[in-house]
């Protein structure tokens, strides 16, 4: 929100001095779809007489993210004199690595934790509960952080694959170190990170020919470094598991399925078991069409609510697709899907060289919605700003 506020005067200056700014045809079309989602949300809460405006104001949220992305990319361009997809990606990697390290510091050092908790309000009371006790950074916790870590893992997967065919292959080890750090600590923060990990490794296997047993020699350095860094990661994890206080608990949470497989001979994850019970479908045609007007915990927003609420979720479900349906029906769900699809499609059209990366990001978003309702529009928003910057550079060169 603060970044969006900073972006407003920058936007005003750009419009006044250069007659350029944030609004173009693509942003306008995105706004239309976000507006449709908001209108459907408004209709649902009005028809159902509920006070839950979670997605009735989605167009405002979309513009907040766009303005924040505009601010970030503008400052990057000011510092470096240019803005590119790979430059932005490197910044995103640095931010996520710092968040992971900060999460460990907050968990390990009470003084740091006290300072962060004093000045940053991000639901620490819930995160610090004995039965929750989750790692968190600054604005990075639970599935919101997990979905963004997952997005970054597939972006790293694409960039490393691209490096294998260029002189930049010397940076592969550095990117892989960041990859494993985010994969491990990210899973300690939120196991949604696993989605990105699986898609990233699957992408590497597909691109390098591992699945067909015909490995492309261009990718030999990738797999060589991958195995070495994986081995080092396992050694460090085992050491920390046995000798660093509280690490055992964090690792067992992050990779519960693997521990269950080794100790019990079966893959079992408690959150997956809970997730199965959350696949609850609407029982009336009205709910399928326009929803019931509840997205947030109804006990917290509606003093007159007498319906079904389990575990803090309306109808007891945290599944993204189902929460959208229960909130504003299939129409609202379709509008939300189109917002993300259009954002990804515009990125593909503008930055066609990175087509695979944006397809992976779309896949991350739509797979995450089978688990939670968090979206990664912010990620697409920043790359839309990259495309806009490149378009401005071309126009400037044409004038010259």
Model-identified regions with their sequence ranges:
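A juxtamembrane structural motif centered on a specific transmembrane helix
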Residues: 215-223, 229-233, 349-353, 383-400
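Hydrophobic transmembrane alpha-helices and their immediate junctions
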Residues: 168, 202, 206, 210, ...
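Long extracytoplasmic/lumenal interhelical loops at the membrane interface
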Residues: 116, 126, 258-328
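Flexible juxtamembrane loops connecting transmembrane helices in multi-pass membrane enzymes
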Residues: 216-225, 237-276
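N-terminal hydrophobic segments of proteins, predominantly signal-anchor/transmembrane helices
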Residues: 4-69, 98, 363-365
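A conserved mid-to-late transmembrane alpha helix and its immediate loop/hinge
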Residues: 136-141, 308-344
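Transmembrane alpha-helices of multi-pass inner-membrane enzymes
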Residues: 154-158, 197-204, 357-400
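Alpha-helical transmembrane segments of multi-pass inner-membrane proteins
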Residues: 89-117, 138-189, 193-210
